[in-house]
């Protein structure tokens, strides 16, 4: 049995790939269960709900990217502090980024719910498609803080030297989504199928964000745990700066999707948006591998810089 790789180890190319494989698998699996979600909606809820989900989904992802920013940016800072040998300060930074991310997620959730309808209308939704997009988005936005935390913890599991545990949580979250999709979307009456799909996704995000919160909130065998902290504007700004590339990459990718949808709904209608949604799912799977690699390597570079 191979020895567990630690951040303090000397990394060769092979060791680095081994260390990042769980992060890559974690992101790919996240993308795959998104595809399964689309499969159930398109096959059981209908074309209009599927088009509505694809229309509003990039907007929901943009709101959740704060988790990527504080995850990749914050994990580099925490890893650097661990490399300097200051574990208490590293845990204070870790706790700060978790609390700020959860608070920001709550604020964005309130704003998102309040402005869902005008934003969906701005994207070109109208009539039945508008109502479907608003319904789906508002259910997902109710648990946005957990979605933000899920993205945040995907990075910090690596920093805590627990990438395999991060993969296990992601698989559990994905299986929750798939099973609930199969139960709710197939068994519920037609008028409730889209709400069932949204509820399945929302509950899976509660698992993905809530389980790590409980794990790090208690005594555990990792090098990180939640503790009392104080507001540190400089640390927050550094995390935002460090994670700005991942933040902008995710925003730009989803913004392009939104712009495509605006034009497609204008010239091709629901069929165009639904067709582009299938292509978007395929693109997500391929890009997930590179995002997973960046999540896995950031703490390594941060630790050795410290």
Describe each region flagged by the PLM.
Residues 25, 37-41, 53, 78, ...:
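Hydrophobic/aromatic residues within transmembrane alpha-helices of membrane transport systems
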Residues 50-110, 150-166, 276-306:
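Small-residue-rich hydrophobic transmembrane alpha-helices
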Residues 14-75, 244-265:
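Signature of the first transmembrane helix
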Residues 57-60, 104, 172-177, 200-208, ...:
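Transmembrane alpha-helical core residues of multi-pass small-molecule transporters
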Residues 1-20, 78-145, 189-244, 286, ...:
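Short alpha-helical transmembrane segments in multi-pass integral membrane proteins
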Residues 71, 140-158, 166-174, 197-213, ...:
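Short runs within selected transmembrane alpha-helices of multi-pass transporters and secretion channels
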Residues 32-50, 120-127, 183-192, 247, ...:
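Helix-terminus/linker motif at the lipid-water interface of multi-pass membrane proteins
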Residues 32-35, 39, 66, 106-117, ...:
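Membrane-embedded alpha-helical segments of multi-pass transporters/permeases
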């Amino acid at each position: 049995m191979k020895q567990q790789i630690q951040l303090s180890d000397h990394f060769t190319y092979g060791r680095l790939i081994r260390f990042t494989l769980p992060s890559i698998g974690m992101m790919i699996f996240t993308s795959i269960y998104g595809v399964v979600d689309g499969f159930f909606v398109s096959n059981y809820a209908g074309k209009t709900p599927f088009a509505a989900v694809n229309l509003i989904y990039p907007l929901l992802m943009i709101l959740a990217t704060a988790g990527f920013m504080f995850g990749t940016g914050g994990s580099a800072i925490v890893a650097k502090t661990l490399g300097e040998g200051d574990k208490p300060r590293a845990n204070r930074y870790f706790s700060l980024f978790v609390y700020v991310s959860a608070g920001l997620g709550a604020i964005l959730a309130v704003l998102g719910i309040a402005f869902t309808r005008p934003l969906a209308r701005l994207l070109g939704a109208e009539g039945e498609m508008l109502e479907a997009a608003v319904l789906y988005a508002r259910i997902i936005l109710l648990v946005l803080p957990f979605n933000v935390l899920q993205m945040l913890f995907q990075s910090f599991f690596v920093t805590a030297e627990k990438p395999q545990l991060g993969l296990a949580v992601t698989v559990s979250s994905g299986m929750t989504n798939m099973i609930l999709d199969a139960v709710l979307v197939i068994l519920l009456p037609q008028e409730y199928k889209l709400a069932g799909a949204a509820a399945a996704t929302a509950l899976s995000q509660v698992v993905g964000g809530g389980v790590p919160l409980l794990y790090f909130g208690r005594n555990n065998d990792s090098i990180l745990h939640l503790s009392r902290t104080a507001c540190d504007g400089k640390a927050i700004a550094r995390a935002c700066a460090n994670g700005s590339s991942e933040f902008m990459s995710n925003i730009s990718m989803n913004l392009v999707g939104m712009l495509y949808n605006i034009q497609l709904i204008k010239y091709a209608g629901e069929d165009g948006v639904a067709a582009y949604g299938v292509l978007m799912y395929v693109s997500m799977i391929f890009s997930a591998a590179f995002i997973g690699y960046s999540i896995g390597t950031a703490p390594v570079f941060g630790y050795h810089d410290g």
